[in-house]
Amino acid sequence: MAEVSAKSVTVEEMAEEDDAAIEERWSLYEAYNELHALAQELETPFEAPAVLVVGQQTDGKSALVEALMGFQFNHVGGGTKTRRPITLHMKYDPQCQFPLCHLGSDDDPSVSLPKSLSQIQAYIEAENMRLEQEPCSPFSAKEIIVKVQYKYCPNLTIIDTPGLIAPAPGLKNRALQVQARAVEALVRAKMQHKEFIILCLEDSSDWSIATTRRIVMQVDPELSRTIVVSTKLDTKIPQFSCSSDVEVFLSPPASALDSSLLGDSPFFTSVPSGRVGYGQDSVYKSNDEFKQAVSLREMEDIASLEKKLGRLLTKQEKSRIGISKLRLFLEELLWKRYKESVPLIIPLLGKEYRSTVRKLDTVSKELSSLDEAKLKERGRTFHDLFLTKLSLLLKGTVVAPPDKFGETLQDERTQGGAFVGTDGLQFSHKLIPNAGMRLYGGAQYHRAMAEFRFLVGAIKCPPITREEIVNACGVEDIHDGTNYSRTACVIAVAKARETFEPFLHQLGARLLHILKRLLPISVYLLQKEGEYLSGHEVFLKRVASAFNSFVESTEKSCRDKCMEDLASTTRYVTWSLHNKNRAGLRQFLDSFGGTEHNTTSGNAIGFSLPQDALGGTTDTKSRSDVKLSHLASNIDSGSSIQTTEMRLADLLDSTLWNRKLAPSSERIVYALVQQIFQGIREYFLASAELKFNCFLLMPIVDKLPALLREELENAFEDDLDSIFDITNLRQSLDQKKRSTEIELRRIKRIKEKFRVMNEKLNSHEFAQNLKAPSVQH
């Protein structure tokens, strides 16, 4: 009797130990389920291990999920109806005769409401219809979370994603092509989570066709965390004509399927057709019958394969065939990942807990500072810090990331406008130093000025036509002769104003764009240092409006000053200013005078203009005069006087009395226009750069602080509640404080669960009890 009693005690103890192990496993599953919900809500960096199901619409994805669950969920149907991922937290409960389901709240994922299968199905269908009506975002990455307890459920977390679409090419299928890209982007984003095990479904008897693997391998190239599943095995077996085809299908070569995939080789599954219900179209009366049909289908598949092969399947081959084998493998794998991840998740939860504590402290401090004196002081402090950041950006800094805030010259031209001449052409941006670098602040301002100098300094005088010269001659108020010096001035100033005025407006727009960019960069620097007035949008908008208005008005004022300079230098020609390169003009006219010939009476006679007509001194002889003097030395004085008079008459005839434009007159006008245009260009370039530096850049440094301070004090004199929106802000902060406190308690509770679980996993006694789930579902 004593022996029997001892044996009874031993059996009872073993049963208690098994129950304890199962209970601890369930506790760990629950902790991970809570962690997964928390990660979805807060978008935290940690994720719980889960199985992500990926497949085409026609791969039997929904049927496979139902077979793994042990009951028909019927949440999709035909076509593209799953538009949000569905997370199924499944828990094995032998006492649960019917599926017990809870639906996670979209507003608070920590809250799960008990729902029937029909209610959950109705909710999912309503969500799908809602998203289908939104053309801009027909799919959503936010998961629908469902918790299920059932006697046939495995202990798994499965995320069922929308089915991938393979649309036909052509314009008429454009809408479906857009949907296909949206689904693929959603699925690819889900696969990025390194903790997820990817269940890749393929419906093909040829492993060289990688419909779903093509997308999966973009994220997991080696398939190291991917389980490949060949679905609809029962329909493929009859397609094989010989045993060798079956051998290749069951054991694909490395050239067709990478051997590094998770599980070493693919799984093969079949799910019997037919729905559970009491209608005429129903095949199964209950989920128990459906479960039995799944098991029977598995045995039939093995028998059919053995018949095709002409041999019995090995133990290794059988371990890859059927829903039950796939479910057991997933459970063991997920359980292993759960245990391995516990020590890694604890520090992440600790970090998130400390971050939430700091967030709560910040909210509490903001609530305590909502009085007039403190708000005014914070506003003045923000003013000083904002100006400090502006000055820092102009002087140069590397604190703001160039990849986020910098602009290349091409970007700058696109956003702020390009320098374009009257011909509509642009210089290549590659000719400008640092064109490919992403700059901001003072460095970007300097590059824009350098581009302006480079482009304007290289501008040549536009072509001059004979018609323009003749039209510019006109008629004087006292005589009808021609004045080619006036003609040259009229043409030069008109060409200069037409050429340079657009560049002035373009320079103003470009520099205005660069200076306005200082505002968001300064805000970023303040946020980075924790000095940003978060929640005070009305006040911040007022500061931003004052800054932008100041920059815009200052740029306009500066541009008006530059326009006055351009108007003055193109209204009246001052020879000492405009004719900068008189030596070049003399050289041009000297060569002209030495080569110009008059063939009248067979005598070769050259002529030159007096020096004072060219703006030079009268005591300096030109080379043409020297040549003429040398020519006249062999002629008697009477002949010399006669020749000089003839030359003077010819000169007056060609430049004063004759309206027929001679080549000599045309060349003189062209030379004068070139010199005047060059003088205007040099003056315009120096004046514009100097004025933009003095009257646009410098006011940012020395006038903006006083203006912002005045704007700030005026704002304080107004209704302070309207400026800082104290009432709404207090309500918002109170709500934020309550939600942060709830979040903190949730993190603390989950953190404590994982801490206790980690201690038990590390204990020798618990390690002996915790084995892979051995419950037969």
From Swiss-Prot:
Keywords for the protein's UniProt record, in alphabetical order: Chloroplast, Coiled coil, Cytoplasm, GTP-binding, Hydrolase, Membrane, Motor protein, Nucleotide-binding, Peroxisome, Peroxisome biogenesis, Plastid, Plastid outer membrane
**Compartment annotation:** Cytoplasm; Plastid, Chloroplast outer membrane; Peroxisome; Cytoplasm, Cytosol
Record GO biological process? chloroplast fission; circadian rhythm; peroxisome fission; response to gibberellin
According to the UniProt record, where is the region G2 motif? 81-83
Topology relative to the lipid bilayer, per the entry, is: Peripheral membrane protein
Q: Which Pfam families is this protein grouped with?
A: Dynamin_N
Question: Region entry G5 motif: which residue ranges?
Answer: 265-268
Domain Dynamin-type G, which positions? 45-343
Gene3D superfamilies (UniProt xref): P-loop containing nucleotide triphosphate hydrolases (3.40.50.300)
Mainly localized where?
A: cytoplasm
One example of the protein's molecular function in GO is: identical protein binding
> Which residues does GTP bind?
55-62, 160-164, 231-234
- PTM comment text: Stabilized at the plastid outer envelope membranes (OEMs) in the constriction site when in complex with GTP, but destabilized after conversion of GTP into GDP leading to turnover with a cytosolic pool.
Q: Name one GO cellular component term.
A: chloroplast
Q: Partners and quaternary state?
A: Forms a homodimer and heterodimers with DRP3A and DRP3B on peroxisomes. Also interacts with FIS1A (but not FIS1B) and PEX11 proteins (PEX11A, PEX11B, PEX11C, PEX11D and PEX11E) on peroxisomes. Interacts with PDV1 and PDV2.
This molecule's function is given as: Mechanochemical GTPase component of both plastid and peroxisome division machinery. Required for the last steps of plastid division specifically in mesophyll-cell, when the narrow isthmus breaks, facilitating the separation of the daughter plastids. Necessary for peroxisome activities. Seems to influence stromule (stroma-filled tubular extensions of the plastid envelope membrane) length and frequency.
Entry similarity comment: Belongs to the TRAFAC class dynamin-like GTPase superfamily. Dynamin/Fzo/YdjA family.
**Name of the protein described by the UniProt record:** Dynamin-like protein ARC5
